[in-house]
Every structure is written in C-alpha cells, then in structure tokens.
C-alpha cells in the first residue's frame, strides 16, 4: 500500500506530510509507521539503545491490558528447529523463568528434547509442572512473546494426542499472555521490527 502511494523508502515515509491519507491503511496505523520511520532514521542514542516513543494510553490497548502481577507468574519460551529433509518440527527446548519465593530472584528451568519421543515427554512434564504450580497460584499467568509459543503448544497437544483438555482450558481462560501486542500498543520503536532481540536493547 505504501509503494502504491509512492512511498518507496524509509526516508520517504519519515518525511510524509501530515494529513496525507493512504487507501487501505488506517490513519492510526499510518501515524505509527511514520513515527517509527522517523525514529529509525534518527541517530541512535550514545549508549546504543534504540529511540522510542511512548504511545498515548488508550483503554483496552498496550499496558492497560497487562494482567495484575501474581507471585506465581511464569515467563515462557520455546525453541524449535525444522528437519530440512522431512519438514518436521522439533521443539528442542522448553524454558521458563519464575520468581524465587524467598528473595524474588529469577529461577530458570528447562526441558530438553533431541527426538520426538523426548519432545512428547518434555511437553508433558512441562504441562504437569505448570499444573502443579497452578494449585499454589491459581491466578498466575504464563507470559510469552509472539504467537509462536501458543501455536507450538497447540501443535504438540494435537500431534501427540496428550494434555488436550488441559491446554484447551488454559486457552479458554487466557492463561497464556502474549506480550508482543502489549509492547506494540505501548511504544513506537526505532527498529526495523519488534522482535524481542530488538526490544531488549531498551533494558
């Protein structure tokens, strides 16, 4: 849509005049894209951190949809690799962080897999670990970044026909919280993407 409107480079977008409308693109989205382009062409901060702007707080977007903090909250990540010959996916690492009850330090826990059978076992062990923690912290949330984790969980429970009822319940009650839309709804980042590797430069 931008190219159709004659905008071919990031500089074109950054210099776009106010009030211009582009067919098929919401004004809010165009404004965010323009602000992001302006930040990207601007020299980076001396400390190497990307430029960013805080968005206006709007109910139902950004930080306003962040759940209330719970002592049992979990930060969750999956790492997978695709077999180039068979085209199959293997989630070789299920990792998570949670708070130490005694001093609030972060504890990292991982389940590794090197084969489909180990992948199934790792998935089942992870689900059971979360279920055990839910008994102690029924209001906890599982935070992840992007849609990959939720999609992979669905694939694993369907592929191995295991833990379907539990996963369905998790999804029905929004146990998993995707932080990506919360981030994109809260800031405009002067980077080419909102990948976690780009966003973490702010910290």
Regions found by a protein language model. Give the residues of each.
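C-terminal extensions
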Residues: 1-98, 102-112, 119-122
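Conserved DEDDh/DEDDy metal-dependent 3′-5′ exonuclease domain
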Residues: 98, 108-203
């Amino acid at each position: 849509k931008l190219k159709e409107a004659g905008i071919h480079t990031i500089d074109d977008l950054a210099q776009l005049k106010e009030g211009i409308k582009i067919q098929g693109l919401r004004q809010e989205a165009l404004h965010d894209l323009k602000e992001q382009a302006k930040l990207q062409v601007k020299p980076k901060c001396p400390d190497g951190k990307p430029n960013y702007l805080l968005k206006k707080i709007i109910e139902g977007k950004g930080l306003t949809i962040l759940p209330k903090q719970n002592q049992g909250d979990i930060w969750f990540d999956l790492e997978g690799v695709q077999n180039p010959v068979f085209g199959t996916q293997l989630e070789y690492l299920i990792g998570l962080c949670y708070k130490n009850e005694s001093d609030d330090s972060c504890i990292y826990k991982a389940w590794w897999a090197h084969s489909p059978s180990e992948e199934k076992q790792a998935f089942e062990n992870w689900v059971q670990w979360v279920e055990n923690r839910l008994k102690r912290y029924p209001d906890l949330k599982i935070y992840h970044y992007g849609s990959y984790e939720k999609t992979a969980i669905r694939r694993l429970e369907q592929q191995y026909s295991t833990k379907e009822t539990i996963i369905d319940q998790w999804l029905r009650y929004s146990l998993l919280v995707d932080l990506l839309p919360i981030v994109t709804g809260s800031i405009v980042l002067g980077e080419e993407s909102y990948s976690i590797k780009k966003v973490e430069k702010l910290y």
